[in-house]
Amino acid sequence: MKLPARVFFTLGSRLPCGLAPRRFFSYGTKILYQNTEALQSKFFSPLQKAMLPPNSFQGKVAFITGGGTGLGKGMTTLLSSLGAQCVIASRKMDVLKATAEQISSQTGNKVHAIQCDVRDPDMVQNTVSELIKVAGHPNIVINNAAGNFISPTERLSPNAWKTITDIVLNGTAFVTLEIGKQLIKAQKGAAFLSITTIYAETGSGFVVPSASAKAGVEAMSKSLAAEWGKYGMRFNVIQPGPIKTKGAFSRLDPTGTFEKEMIGRIPCGRLGTVEELANLAAFLCSDYASWINGAVIKFDGGEEVLISGEFNDLRKVTKEQWDTIEELIRKTKGS
């Protein structure tokens, strides 16, 4: 193979979503670059069935915030199908009632609905009292209530910042502390699970209030895992990557522009599913995971490790291009 006099390696910084991919190798006027489709997804087909045995949560009480839609609805559906008595909470009572009736009919187990704005500590206190009254002390607590939207940070008002942090951080704290105190009084344990995001750890522009608040949720969960284990309570976190739900995508990708970009940076080649997340959540809240405490589980198809590695975009280089590169490297050895 005839080689050019020079090859320029231009490993630049990542371009914003929606822009043309950067050039990796310049071969004269020809760009050595390979577009890749997410064909690898065929190796990672999602399973839709329940992972745990039937009746794994028989006799258990589960409390799920944000349980009326999306991920919360998916987790509630699975827990109820496995025998749990579920209580769901959110601000929209009409949505909650419809979800509770649908899941109850589907699984044959009663699902209770309680209206609650987690930003209001008095309302949270009343909700927990009603929860205990209708179902008993919870064995499972899933903090799933969330709020988020994309915006340049310099455009955020104090109220916009407060709205997100009040729901995500303060709301999770109010629910966790109120239920925790009641469990301590009753000398009962429970498994707590919080749903955050991978950028709670890495940080991310344009969702700064959410990233900050969810990082706080993770710190709180790990701290309570250390402090309240003596009371029989476990605290774990799931960091989901992109999972297509109507609510989240309507705010974070309203035009559908970025979905292909998202898939392109996931090694498994597809978005996650609600059912997969529900299976992971159910496992972490089950007795099968009784020795898992203080864990933060990434659930992102490998997205974070791909975008974090400086040279991971070399996956787009073809075998023929690698042959060229290898020959060039051999020629320059010792120079």
From Swiss-Prot:
What are the boundaries of the transit peptide?
Answer: 1-34
GO process terms (BP):
fatty acid beta-oxidation; positive regulation of cold-induced thermogenesis
Q: Which reaction does it catalyse?
A: a (2E,4E)-dienoyl-CoA + NADPH + H(+) = a 4,5-saturated-(3E)-enoyl-CoA + NADP(+); a (2E,4Z)-dienoyl-CoA + NADPH + H(+) = a 4,5-saturated-(3E)-enoyl-CoA + NADP(+); (2E,4E)-hexadienoyl-CoA + NADPH + H(+) = (3E)-hexenoyl-CoA + NADP(+)
Q: Which residues carry this modification: N6-acetyllysine?
A: 42, 49, 97, 230, 244, 260, 319
Disease annotated for this entry: 2,4-dienoyl-CoA reductase deficiency: A rare, autosomal recessive, inborn error of polyunsaturated fatty acids and lysine metabolism, resulting in mitochondrial dysfunction. Affected individuals have a severe encephalopathy with neurologic and metabolic abnormalities beginning in early infancy. Laboratory studies show increased C10:2 carnitine levels and hyperlysinemia.
| The family this protein is said to belong to | Belongs to the short-chain dehydrogenases/reductases (SDR) family. 2,4-dienoyl-CoA reductase subfamily.
Name of the molecule in the record: 2,4-dienoyl-CoA reductase [(3E)-enoyl-CoA-producing], mitochondrial
